């Protein structure tokens, strides 16, 4: 599949209302894990945007996060109203929240982007949703169904509905130090079809998705078949040319299930991985971002790599970012992005 250009990005997280401020705070080790006292659940720590009043629904919180992330994106790259723009958005898997979120975001997207080609496409794939959206957008750009693609994801696990569900499932982090810290966020990329622009923030080289039959919501041991296949597909893609990722970011929640899955897939795809092997997980600074994980971590990674990591060398390869994520229902995805330094982007 042909590469797609990344023209701009925007994000909103509890660490900052822009991609740049979120990335800087995360890298500095700042966290916003606050104790909340909700009558519906036991006292729990969560990572939430304090500017949104507590008690708002999942749809309301997701809409406000999306609104702020899109403002950040438009500042980074003003849209040309003459370009044909289509949208693919990743959202939560759960039915009650997903319906309300779709309704809220559809209205906002059409108001914010009057030239949107058709209705937005929503993918209810949890932590795997962003990668499914990315793959669908890349196919549409290649087929010239649109000139520009708005691709992103948004979610909030800090609303009453998701919090109650996590409490019922005993997923909340407790005294035994196993569980999740609920988080929330939104992030979006603006992609262009190959050859449309001469300058970009980065290049989406390839994206792969798969479905894991032994997912978290069933009882058989997870053997990481889907994540292994996704990594193998990225390795085999001609655009990667056998390169290793320089930076690996994951949507992991801090639960052992996901750590074991990644370790298994890593051992089967060592040539693709950073050397020495290191990774940064969403849980370290933002908790469980749900469906927003892939998009937010991609935006942070683009910020972190949008500067020279070493003295410039003629014809040296650009930094390679890999992001991956898996949902509770087995939707798995990963992508490889070649990042442009600030100097190169301004030429």
Q: What kind of feature is each model-predicted range?
A:
Residues 1-127, 131-135, 139-145, 154, ...:
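Conserved "HGTGT" condensation-loop signature of ketosynthase/thiolase-family condensing enzymes
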């Amino acid at each position: 599949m042909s590469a797609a250009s990344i023209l701009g990005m925007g994000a909103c997280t509890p660490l900052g209302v822009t991609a740049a401020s979120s990335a800087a705070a995360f890298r500095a080790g700042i966290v916003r894990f606050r104790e909340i006292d909700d009558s519906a659940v036991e006292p729990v720590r969560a990572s939430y945007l304090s500017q949104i009043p507590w008690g708002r629904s999942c749809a309301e919180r997701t809409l406000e996060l999306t609104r702020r992330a899109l403002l950040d994106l438009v500042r980074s790259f003003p849209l040309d109203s003459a370009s044909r723009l289509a949208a693919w958005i990743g959202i939560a898997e759960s039915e009650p929240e997903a319906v309300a979120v779709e309704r809220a975001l559809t209205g906002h997207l059409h108001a914010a982007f009057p030239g949107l080609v058709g209705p937005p496409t929503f993918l209810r794939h949890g932590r795997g949703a962003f990668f499914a959206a990315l793959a669908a957008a890349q196919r549409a750009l290649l087929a010239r169904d649109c000139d520009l693609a708005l691709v992103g994801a948004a979610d909030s696990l800090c609303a009453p509905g998701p919090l109650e569900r996590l409490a019922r499932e005993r997923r909340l982090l407790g005294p035994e130090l196993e569980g999740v810290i609920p988080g929330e966020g939104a992030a979006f990329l603006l992609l262009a079809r190959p050859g449309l622009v001469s300058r970009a923030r980065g290049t989406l080289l390839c994206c792969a998705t798969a479905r894991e039959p032994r997912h978290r919501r069933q009882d058989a041991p997870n053997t990481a078949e889907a994540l292994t296949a996704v990594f193998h597909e990225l390795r085999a893609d001609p655009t990667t040319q056998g390169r290793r990722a320089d930076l690996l970011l994951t949507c992991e929640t801090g639960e052992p299930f996901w750590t074991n899955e990644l370790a298994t897939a890593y051992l089967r795809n060592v040539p693709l991985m950073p050397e020495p092997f290191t990774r940064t997980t969403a849980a370290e600074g933002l908790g469980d971002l749900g469906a927003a994980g892939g998009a937010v971590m991609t935006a942070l990674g683009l910020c972190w790599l949008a500067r020279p990591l070493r003295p410039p060398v003629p014809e040296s390869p650009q930094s390679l970012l890999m992001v991956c994520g898996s949902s509770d229902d087995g939707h798995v995805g990963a992508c490889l992005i070649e990042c442009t330094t600030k100097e190169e982007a301004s030429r």
